[in-house]
Regions:
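Active-site SXXK
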Residues: 1, 21, 47-78, 84-85, ...
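Short beta-to-alpha loop/turn elements within the nucleotide-binding domains of ABC transporters
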Residues: 27, 73, 183
Length: 380
């Protein structure tokens, strides 16, 4: 990884690799701030982006374990506004070109991104992309309750359960947590996950007194060529003051900041053991591919991702590709748009966390190489 820092492909990276529950390697290389020559330390704070999703997934599964919601409950049981959905017809040219949904959205479908919701990010030029952006669904000034109202006025991309599309589903689940628990999302996460696991630096913004520990964010030289050297500072992504001050919208899909030790604490809590956050059956279910046989996840800008299904809150590898470690069948993993990544592979008895701040993406050649080497090092 030092080579990639020297080549200006990544500014810096922190990682921890586990064999079973034991940390066998933990290091930081490179910079937290290249311009200031600030060397990266374990206590530096990263923008988690979509690493946030696993926290909200765990919150939902805690409520499921307590019997307060069910995985196959219709969403209107918690959020009546999202009942009686409309779906865009095949080949629709306007938001009015819709038909009734064949079935309601379920909690399970929200966890697996099979609900029919979209993101309004990855599919520019489409009818739904335009609709999401005109409604400003992702506006950080919009509280979760108001975001649900905006989504209620928009059609689904496909019938619930009939496809896979990365989406605002986890933000919707954040609102479900609030409605079911009676607490704000940040309060629930703090009480049930952050405090329970001793996570002292994870939250929806970095307090002013700690902002000197926030890692600088950089753009790569070319979004389409992640191996092209060159980094440009981009601290105002995805919007000015993001992660530096509180915003009304507590984004369950991408709003948290965290550190390597905090992320490591969560990953360890998702491994079998007496101090696991969730029950063994719950963890097994989360790490089980929920998609139909042969179906893979896909992104509008990338196409299908070979060998990858989806569990409850993360991708599941059912057929490793040449980019993957050969013994990664059953690996449960996800990451964030600014270069954070976590994985758990029960079969290979390994898990890990990788933290960088290079926008955009976590499925890049340098991370693939790191993970292959990590698996080799632990015998996986």
């Amino acid at each position: 990884m030092q080579r990639y820092v020297d080549q200006e492909i990544i500014p810096g990276v922190s990682w921890a690799v586990l064999r079973g529950r034991e940390v066998v390697d933990q290091q930081c290389v490179g910079f937290a701030d290249r311009e200031a020559n600030t060397v990266l330390r374990p206590d530096h704070i990263f923008r988690a982006f979509s690493n946030t999703k696993i926290f909200v997934t765990c919150a939902i599964m805690l409520l499921v374990e307590e019997g307060r919601i069910g995985l196959d409950d219709p969403i209107e049981k918690c959020l009546p506004q999202l009942g009686n959905r409309k779906v865009l017809k095949q080949g629709a040219t306007s938001l009015a070109d819709v038909e009734p949904a064949k079935s309601p959205i379920t909690i399970r479908q929200l966890l697996t991104h099979t609900s029919g919701l979209s993101y309004g990010i990855f599919d520019p030029g489409t009818v739904l992309f335009k609709g999401y952006n005109e409604a400003r669904v992702l506006n950080p000034l919009t509280p979760l309750a108001d975001m649900i109202d905006k989504l209620a006025d928009l059609p689904l991309s496909y019938h619930p359960g009939a496809g896979w599309e990365y989406s605002v589903a986890t933000d919707v689940l954040g609102r479900v947590v609030e409605v079911v628990s009676g607490k704000s999302l940040d309060a629930f996460l703090k009480a049930r996950i952050f405090d329970a696991l001793g996570m002292t630096d994870t939250g929806f913004h970095v307090p002013e007194a700690q902002q000197g520990r926030l890692v600088a964010l950089y753009n790569g030289a070319d979004v389409l060529d992640p191996m092209k050297p060159g980094l440009t500072r981009a601290d105002n992504l995805p919007y000015p003051q993001a992660y530096r001050q509180p915003f009304p919208r507590l984004s369950g899909g991408g709003g948290l900041v965290s550190t390597l030790p905090d992320m490591l604490a969560l990953v360890r809590a998702l491994l079998p053991g007496s101090d696991a956050l969730l029950k063994p059956d719950t963890l097994r279910l989360m790490m089980t591919n929920q998609l139909p046989s042969g179906q893979t996840i896909r992104f509008a800008n990338l196409g299908p991702i070979p060998g990858k299904g989806f569990g409850l809150g993360g991708a599941v590898t059912f057929a490793p590709t040449p980019f993957d470690p050969p013994n990664s069948v059953g690996e449960f993993q996800w990451g964030g748009l600014a270069g954070t990544h976590w994985w758990i592979c029960p079969e290979a008895n390994t898990a890990g966390v990788l933290m960088a701040q290079r926008y955009m993406g976590f499925w890049n050649p340098f991370f693939f190489e790191f993970k292959r080497l990590a698996y080799q090092a632990v015998g996986g």
